[in-house]
Amino acid sequence: MKKKFLAIVTAALIGTTAFASVASAASGTIDVISREDGSGTRGAFIELFGIEEKQGDEKVDMTTEDASITNSTSVMMTTVSGDENAIGYISLGSLNDTVKAVKIDGAEASAENVANDTYKVSRPFNIVTGEKLSDAAQDFENYIMSADGQQIVEDNGYIKAADDAKAYEQSDAEGKVVVAGSSSVTPVMEKLKEAYEKVNGGKITVEVQQSDSTTGITSAAEGICDIGMASRELKDEETSENLTATEIARDGIAVVVNNDNDIDDLTSDQVKAIFTGETTEWEDLAK
């Protein structure tokens, strides 16, 4: 379900940029779709495209007040797939044929291009833990970072974090592990959970709870979950809470439009102008 986001920010003047040529553009008002405030994908997106601007001592999210807000990757995809004038952004690893990813600055959104740094719009997938991990949670983390776990990461379209990982060695731990947070990290975490539970023969069960990155980090800090999931780096105030972030994968952020939209390529400046509300009509991209 989408709703209008009423941001308490001031308008910013964005410098004139050279827009990429669009041979056959869509027409009508651009329907901007964004994620909720606690989303790690949103946090990384606004930083990478310069939508977050420094004003005094604070960083301000300049996402247009006209944007509609979705609260998960799946809802974002459903919203964009059902609206010919929509534009949004999702985890590259979650991309399927219900929406179309546009090239950014001429680079296709693909795991290969993220790995070779041709596609610049990428961010880490982190697991977040407190000072003390249960034996069961430590064993699951060991599996994620093993060669076995990292192969699952790669098989599901993400960039593995550890090229020299060693094979998983099962411990004697038993119990339950609760993992909570980012909706972008959730799909690959579900795959890791499934494979891990087969390997350990049911001695350790894993429960994955989907929310957003900020909720996952907070839950890990407060001991509500064993492991938090975040699709962004920790903020300064979060690192001071004795939390440790471990990168388990790298993922691109795909800028997506409806499959019936003729636009295939946007510049970074165009994306910024769209999401800050400077560009509001699809026809303006062809000028």
Residue ranges and their predicted role:
Residues 1-10:
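Positively charged n-region of N-terminal signal peptides that target proteins for export
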Residues 10, 19-287:
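Exported/periplasmic ABC-transporter solute-binding proteins
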